[in-house]
Amino acid sequence: MAGHSKWANIKHRKARQDAVKGKVFTKIIREIVSAAKQGDPDPDKNPRLRAVIEKALSVNMTRDTINRAVARGTGGDDNDNMDEVSYEGYGIGGVAVLVETMTDNLNRTVSEVRHAFTKNDGNLGTTGSVAYLFNKRGEISFNDTSLEDEVMLVALDAGALDIENDGESLLVITEWENFGHVKDALNAAGLVSDNAEVTMSPSTSAEIDNVADAEKVMKMIDMLEDIDDVQEVYSNVNFSDEVMAQLEQ
């Protein structure tokens, strides 16, 4: 949990930086269109669409922009057809990396993804090489641990799988399909989370305890996230406290 929250902090800082450039908006709109095209346009009946709308709202995308993207997805425009492909590989130190993409040119995408791995002493693996190390789930976090009893009561009653407390924050874990329902229940009880997302959570972690390797991993992930076709990058990296302190300087 501690390692996860530290890595999440780095990811969220980068997400805010990307949002300024509009890159996050572009990627989320693409995902909304795809989710609406492949499922029900009503987010209450489409867990995937609900999850990506929550993501859009978390970066302050307007409801109007979201609704237009949903309308695009239900309009049947062939120009919006994209292949959704996941790539798997390893970074330095045995760090497992899962890359989710949406693309209209598979050759371009795999070339750019492979380059990001090899440029940073990693390697692109075969399908199934690391995916088994990740579980898709909903995560709802609270920075105020004093809310534990209230959060636990509401979340478990709404069907949450577990609540973790690492002494610094609370993490509510849900099945990804039930993420929206649990979040709504918490909101209705006045328990507004500090972060909420559907993610691929690693079942094991790869420890990095030196700055050189950590910087290499960070650079690789930055390069992957900067690829236009890449939607999400997940990793099981865990930095030691000493390395984290130096990375945050």
Curated annotation (Swiss-Prot):
BP term (GO), one: regulation of DNA-templated transcription
Top-level taxon in the UniProt lineage: Bacteria
GO terms for MF: DNA binding
Location in the cell: Cytoplasm
Main location: cytoplasm
Keyword Transcription regulation (UniProt): yes
GO cellular component terms given for this protein: cytosol
SUPFAM superfamilies: YebC-like
InterPro entries: Integrase-like_N, TACO1_YebC-like_2nd/3rd_dom, TACO1_YebC_N, Transcrip_reg_TACO1-like, Transcrip_reg_TACO1-like_dom3, YebC-like
Residues in coiled coil: none
Keyword Nuclease: no
NCBIfam families in UniProt: PRK00110.1 (NF001030), PRK12378.1 (NF009044), YebC/PmpR family DNA-binding transcriptional regulator (TIGR01033)
Annotated protein name in UniProt: Probable transcriptional regulatory protein Pcryo_1479
Originating species: Psychrobacter cryohalolentis (strain ATCC BAA-1226 / DSM 17306 / VKM B-2378 / K5)
